[in-house]
Structure formats: structure tokens, C-alpha cells
Amino acid sequence: MLQGKRQAMSVFNMAWNSNKFFWDGRAHLLRDQAILPIQDELEMDETLENVLSKLSASQMYKDQFTRVYGDDDITVDKMALAMEQFMLSIVSYDSKYDQWVAGTTELTASEERGRLLFETEYNPFFQELSGADCAHCHGGSNFENDLYMNNGLDADADFADLGRENVTNDPMDRARFKVPSLRNIELTPPYMHDGRFSTLEEVVDHYNEGIHPSTSLDPAIQATIETGLFLTSDDKVDLVNFLKTLTDHSFLTDTRYSDPF
């Protein structure tokens, strides 16, 4: 059995992604992202020609392509555009956090403390005022910044995946990966680009006390290496509880995404 080296990224709210696709940004457009896994030997290990042949043999798909494009000539471009449009329709915006923002529900005391930790910057001078500084990378309404960053998983000598550098050939992009959205993060283990952490608690521990220095490490994370984030056991529990408020249960049960036919 072939073993991949990267964890699959979530596919929702893609319309707000303006800085290429995949962990390393090798796909410029979402329609490009749609067809690359088909041909990847570690994923579907198929050929586009074979996929087109299968689709063309299905009357259901021929009818669908005729309805959309005016004829039943199934091509790679049409297939990619159709998948792109479907993925653009997948949106998640009704988590408990969103309901709290709208004023229709309340966060628990633990969730609220976690939110404040999430949004408060690291403060090396006043520990009691320091937060987890999560919003530095995972800010905004989609809880990501659409950038490629090195989050301190490994030291230079231990990089098993060069990440964005494989695309740009820029050494400063070494081990930098796309910052993912934290929406629905409770339901998408394992975590990090290589799936090395099984739980959110492990992820929090990494940022609190497990950062490895390297040449391309994000400066904000670099600043925390000597002291860590000062998070207590209770802080960690609160932070994870807040992250779980980002789960959108209506999105998870929306049949438009699980059974579009």
C-alpha cells in the first residue's frame, strides 16, 4: 500500500481563497486543484483519459453535461470547471461561534476564556496578559490568513518535506505550508500538513512548548521559543473548547454536499 506524506486539506469556503491551492500552492486555480489528485500516483492514480471514458459511458453524466454545457461532449476542461463550481458552493458559516457573533447564543465561560486566549497576542513581559496568539495566523472570519508559513514543526536538518519551496525554488519558502482554516477543526484529525498530531490537545502543546527553530520559521512563532506561550492546563482546556465552537453541524449534515444527486 502506497503511503502519502500530506494530510488532505478541507474543502469549504474556497471562494475566499485568493492565494493558490494545496499545502504548497502548486495549483493556481481551483479547477487545477480539482484534477491533480486524479493523476497523483499516491492518491487516485488515474489518467484523465480513463476518467473521461468512464464519464462518457454514463448516460447520467452525459445528461448532466448536456444540461450545463449544451452538449454531451465531456472534456477535461468541462469536468474541471464543474468540480470547481461545486466546490465553490460548499460553504460553512453556521457554527456556535457564528451564532454567538450574530447574538443568538452564548459561549460558556470556558469557551469565552478560550476565545480571549485565541485572540490575545503573546506578551513576553507580562505573562498574566499573554495569550495564545492564534489569530496571528488564523484570524479573520475564516480563521486563516491565506499565506504560507513555517510553524516550527521541525528544525532545518529534519525537514522531510520542503513545502512551498518545491514550487517557488526560494529557500525562504522551505517548510512553509498553506495556513488552513480552523473551521470544523474538531472533526478533521490528524493535524498539520503531515498529520503528525492526533488531537487538538497535542497541537496546543506544540505551540505552547514544542517549537523547533529553523531558518524560515515565522517571526511571531520564533519569538515564543525561549518562554513558550505560558499556557496553563486550564488555558489549554479553554482554548480547545473554543476551537470546538467552530464546528458547523448544519454544514456536516447538508445533503447538497454528501449526495448532490
Task: Give, region by region, the residue ranges found by the protein language model.
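Post-cleavage N-terminal segment of exported redox proteins
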Residues: 45-124, 139-144, 225-261
